[in-house]
Amino acid sequence: GIIPEPIGGIPGNFAMVGVFEKGKADVKFTARSTGGHASAPTANTPIARLSAFVTDVEKHAPFRKKFLPEVTAMFTRLAPYAPFGLRLVMGNLWLFAPLMKVVLPRVSAQAGAMLRTTIAFTMQSGSDAYNVLPQEATLGANMRFIPHQGEQESLAIIRRLAEKHGLEMEVVHTNDYSEPVDIHGEAFRQVERVIGETFPGLPVSPYVMTGATDAQFYQP
C-alpha cells in the first residue's frame, strides 16, 4: 500500500510492499482455586496469578529481537529520506542494530513489532460479584509470530511462563507466518517496475505485515 510516513520521522509517501506476514494465535489462560468470600481472601488467588503472569511477560519481554533481512532492507531503502541523524542510524544497522533494538519499540510500536514475536493481553474474566473470590479466572491474548521464532517456539515460551505461574494454557486458534518473499527475486523486481510505471518517483520498500490478511491462503 501507499503509506505516508511509514516510520515516525520519515516524511512523504512510500509504496510499502508486504513481503511476509506474521503468524497469529488466540490463546486463553486459566487460573483455578477453591474460591471463597472476599472478607477472608486466600493467598495467590486466580486473578493474582494471572496478574503476576502478565507482569512477568511485560517486564521480561521473552521474545528475541532480530533484524531480519527484509527489515534491514526496509530501513536501508527508507534511510535516504530520513533526517540526518535518523538517516545515519538507519543506513548503518551493521553498527547501530543493538541500539535500534532497544530504541525502536519505544519510538514506534509498529516498527518494534517487526523485530520479534509479540503478545497482547486483550480479554479477562473472573468473579461475577465484587465480594466473591472466583474459582476460575481467565485471560485472553493475541500473539503474532516472527519467522526467527515461529509458531511452535513462541507458543512453547509462553506455555512455560504460564506453567510457572500455575496457569492452564489453551491455544484457541493458530497459524504460522507466511514464507518471506525473495526481495532480490524477479517477482519483487516486477512489482517494483509496475509501481514505478504507475506512480513515477514514488519510493518502493519491502514491508513486514504485522497484521493478518488473506495472504496465507495463497501460499503453495
Please annotate each region the language model reported.
Residues I2-P220:
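Metal-dependent amide/peptide-bond hydrolase catalytic core
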